[in-house]
Amino acid sequence: MDKKYIPSALVLYLNYFIHGIGCSILSQQVVKEMLASQWGLKDVMAVTSIAAALGLGRLISLPFAGPLSDKLGRRLSVIIGCASYVIFLVGIAFSPNTTIAYIAAVLGGIANSFLDTATYPAVTEIIYKYTGIATMGIKFFISVAQLLMPFFLGIVA
């Protein structure tokens, strides 16, 4: 393992910390209530359909995200994933209705696909002696973000 690439690995792992937040934010009751009010919905559970759009975006983009990552490079795939996550998070927070939120959530799924196709190979190449630990690090950062999210919301709300 070349130590000069450790900061790169940490940045890649940090992307998955953000991914953990993105995945769990729509499942938090406080957020559901706020978004239902923002979108003029009477039923808080209607927000769950927006969360399902994350999976749809992932399914749509997986067939081409991998080949694009191989062809254009992992760095560009990570940038596309990060940019899509920014659009997703800002779009969900400021969407005036469920249509815009659904589109933003599809972009969140696309972000996840692009990050997966670039980050997994990158961290296993950086930490090549311990590839199992390298991929477990991704799950670790997702889990830590999901663990901390309710506490962050409790402080803010």
Language-model regions, residue ranges each:
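C-terminal ends and interior cores of transmembrane alpha-helices
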Residues: A83-P96
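Residue-level signature of mid-helix packing/kink "hotspots" within the transmembrane helices
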Residues: L54-P63, Q146-L147
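Cytoplasmic helix-loop-helix junction between adjacent transmembrane helices
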Residues: V106-F140
